[in-house]
């Protein structure tokens, strides 16, 4: 039975994409039995985490550094350090870094298996749907 897990983000290997990377510090792979997922997301300048949604989890985003824009429907909103964003399951969104420095934010999900679906599965930087954790 799992009692607790301590993870050092400095020791976590990033999952790399064309747009940046994610360091998953807690999920059911890191801590078997964990029912949530928690990661540190890095979006490179000029790059976009493409349009996607999560069928099985709520998402909380907390921006640590940099600035990015997030799109819901046809409207863009600015995220800056210190802002927190709540995204219900099933809401399509994409994040774009229009700045000159990387954007770093914490992403917390209410489920370890998020059920992520991309609008364009052939978009650059998208992992295949067979991937179990994204």
Regions found by a protein language model. Give the residues of each.
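Short acidic-glycine-tyrosine-enriched beta hairpin
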Residues: 74-89
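A short, N-terminal "cap"/entry segment at the start of jelly-roll beta-barrel domains
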Residues: 1-36, 116-134
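Short beta-strand His + acidic residue motifs that chelate non-heme Fe in jelly-roll/DSBH
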Residues: 50-52, 70-71, 87, 93-99
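A short hydrophobic beta-strand segment most commonly corresponding to one strand
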Residues: 40-41, 86, 101-116
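Glycine- and acidic-residue-biased ligand/ion/polar-headgroup-sensing regions
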Residues: 56-58, 62-68
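Structural motif
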Residues: 67-69, 76, 92, 102
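Conserved short histidine dyad/triad with adjacent acidic residue
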Residues: 24, 39-54
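Short strand-connecting beta-turns/loops that link adjacent beta-strands
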Residues: 56, 100-101
